[in-house]
A protein has these predicted regions:
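A generic, residue-level signal for flexible/boundary positions that often mark functional hotspots
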Residues: 12, 29, 63, 71, ...
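Serine-esterase "nucleophile elbow" of acetyl-processing enzymes
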Residues: 17-70, 75, 80-89
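Alpha-helical cap/lid subdomain in secreted, periplasmic
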Residues: 23, 50-60, 76-223
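Generic detector of intrinsically disordered, low-complexity, polar/charged segments
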Residues: 6, 19, 29, 65-68, ...
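Short linear motifs at secondary-structure transitions and domain/linker junctions
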Residues: 4, 40-44, 68-71, 110-111, ...
């Protein structure tokens, strides 16, 4: 009798633990620069994702976090990922970086050379994967919204975005191709070839429509 009671107690304890485990929220973290830093503000793309989850009745299934810092480049992400990402034990991490790696070459004389960008990027991804994190990579969107590729940094943005696309394919990891999504949107909504005001308010940072587009694309990859 004692043995049966012990067996029953063990069974119910296991069921309780499994039930508790099943209710654990999936942690999703967005890792990046000022665009992601602003994404947590009201109306930002991360805030919109949270709102959408609530409307879908899915808030209990996800914990959404932002870890963006203005001006960050890929090596900044490498240096702070232990503190700002790995310590949070996320299930999914979106890596959205590259604009400052390109932009700061001309604006500040810094930036990140193409070969170093790839090495740091791979190191960031590999370290996250070693902790069992699902990594989704994101191409840098725009530095200027002209649709004819006449923006000053379009050449480098295309180069770095192509590297990210190839890296994602070779390593079989998720990709959100915002470079492509933004260009396709601008082709349809920027007939006057404007430099800003379509999806950004200053050529880089997102306006209302930009945040909505990014939230939609990120959500697709989360599912």
């Amino acid at each position: 009798m004692t043995g049966k009671l012990l067996l029953l107690a063990t069974f119910f304890a296991c069921m309780f633990l499994l039930s508790f485990r099943g209710e654990r929220k999936k942690k999703v973290l967005f890792f990046g620069d000022s665009i992601t830093q602003m994404g947590v503000d009201k109306g930002g793309y991360i805030d919109l994702i949270k709102t959408d989850l609530a409307q879908r009745g899915l808030s209990g299934q996800y914990e959404i976090m932002g870890a963006g810092i203005g001006g960050n480049k890929i090596y900044d992400l490498f240096l702070r990922m232990d503190k700002d990402v790995l310590s949070q034990n996320p299930d999914i991490v979106f890596i959205w970086v590259g604009v400052n790696d390109v932009w700061h070459k001309s604006s500040m004389g810094t930036g990140t050379d193409y070969d170093k960008f790839g090495k740091f990027y791979d190191a960031v991804v590999k370290k996250m994967q070693a902790q069992g994190i699902k990594v989704i990579v994101v191409t840098p969107a725009v530095i200027g919204e002209r649709v004819d590729y006449s923006n000053a940094q379009d050449g480098d943005l295309n180069l770095y975005s192509n590297w990210i696309r190839k890296y994602a394919a070779e390593n079989q990891i998720g990709l959100v191709d915002l470079r492509k999504s933004f260009h396709e949107y601008s082709l349809a909504h920027n007939p006057n070839n404007l430099e800003q005001g379509i999806l950004t308010y200053d050529r880089v940072h997102l306006n209302e429509k930009g945040n909505a587009l990014v939230a939609s694309e990120m959500w697709k990859a989360m599912q």
